Amino acid sequence: MAYAVVRVRGSVGVRGNIADTMKMLRLHRVNHCVVIPDNEHYTGMIKKVKDYVTYGEIDKDTLVALILKRGRLPGNKRLTEELVKELTELPVEELAEKIIAGEIKIKDTPIKPVFRLHPPRKGYDRAGVKKGFSIGGALGYRSGKINDLLNKMM
């Protein structure tokens, strides 16, 4: 299983240890997304920054769309299915399955590990970016609903 983590809030007024954790997760700007494996190290980092990000389990279809639409190579070159197959020796769907299963990390491929997304179309549909998802906001854990948000942001 892999998590998609999207930074929702900015950097003004963020405590130093949380800002450092955001840097370690490569979430330098708002609407940046990373896909990370499910292990105790990353889980602890996510719990620390939960008041500034939203996260959940990403599915295969969303990850394939994310790689093809928003994935980039060094030099800001766009990705195509043929280019992904040439660079990783795997089709995009199989690459997505292996990333979700934890067999491959995105940082082990030539794909840039950060996906730069648009703000969500029609907004977050919630009470704002200062409240948790469980009480009507946009922050924190949102399980499979992260896929709907990512589709709105691609």
From Swiss-Prot:
Superkingdom to which the source organism belongs: Archaea
CDD domains attached to this UniProt entry: Ribosomal_L7_archeal_euk
Any GO BP: maturation of LSU-rRNA from tricistronic rRNA transcript (SSU-rRNA, 5.8S rRNA, LSU-rRNA)
Gene3D superfamilies in the record: 1.10.15.30, Ribosomal protein L30, ferredoxin-like fold domain
A GO molecular function held by the record: RNA binding
Alphabetically ordered keywords of this record: Ribonucleoprotein, Ribosomal protein
Keyword Ribonucleoprotein: yes
Keyword Ribonucleoprotein: yes
One GO cellular component term noted in the UniProt record for this chain: cytosolic large ribosomal subunit
Subunit structure: Part of the 50S ribosomal subunit.
Assigned protein family: Belongs to the universal ribosomal protein uL30 family.
Protein name: Large ribosomal subunit protein uL30
